Amino acid sequence: MQDRYLAGRTAWVTGGASGMGRATALRLARAGANVAVGSLVESQRAVALEDQNVHTPPDKALAETRAEIAAHGVGALALPLDVCSDTSVDTFYRSAVAEFGHVDILVNAAGSSARKLIIDHPDALWHRMIDVNLNGPYRTIKRCFPGMIERRYGRIVNIASTAANVGYVRHSAYCAAKAGLLGLTRCVALEGAAHNVSCNAVNPGWVATDSNFSACEQEIAIAGLDISVEEYRRRVAEDLPQKRFLDPDEVAALIAFLCRDEAFGITAEAITIAMGSHW
């Protein structure tokens, strides 16, 4: 028998049509939560910049994810969402509230990366990385936080990265944005502590997602390697302590645990899940 410890709760998951976001949405649904997923999709691809690694699942992924959520006997909502747009975030939040009445759980899984040296980093690309990875969570938190405080319940989990703790060549904007997300996480946690609202960050290492595999393609091109993506992934995995990539569901399991009542004392934390690797 499944543990429906989130029955009656409503979760909003950004980046929820693929990767870690989708895995998290399904985990929360299995735990009994109604789930609203938002995601940038292929028809919105025009918003991406040159050299930006952004995975945009096909538009049908929203309907497919919605159906998989609903199969767990909970309410499901799936709509396009651009976390860089105030209008898009506002529209999605209003739709979720109209459907479910409130948002109890927020998981910020939407993200994007770019590979550029600082000396030739386009300003527009820098600002986009900050906007997606830091301002995006700020926008969604700002919408949900007042209601959580008013109802005296909330769980916020931001998917950051091991990049928040280390520096990496050609990843200055991504590392800066994810480090900033840790700062935002801690401040939200302190402001919510007296109101039964927790806020944590999860720092994954290498995860087997389409976005990560797209990043591998970029690394191959930058290094001028004549190898397949599969071979590059094999070499990366070989350098990791557990010799493998994480499954998205492993990250989702951690996030779902942080949404338990028993986990309320865990707040303002940045929890690394990287198989013993620093990156």
Label the model's feature ranges.
Residues 193, 198, 266-268:
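Short, small/polar-rich loop/turn modules that mediate ligand/substrate recognition or access, typified
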Residues 1-2, 166, 244, 255-256, ...:
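Short C-terminal tail/terminal secondary-structure segment
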Residues 146, 190-191, 264:
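Alpha-helical segment proximal to the catalytic Tyr-Lys
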Residues 161:
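Residue(s) in the substrate-gating loop at a strand-loop-helix junction
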Residues 117-118, 125-130, 236:
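Substrate-binding pocket helix/loop in short-chain dehydrogenase/reductase
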Residues 1-100, 114, 124-125, 217-218:
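Short-chain dehydrogenase/reductase
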Residues 141, 177, 185:
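Active-site helix of classical SDR
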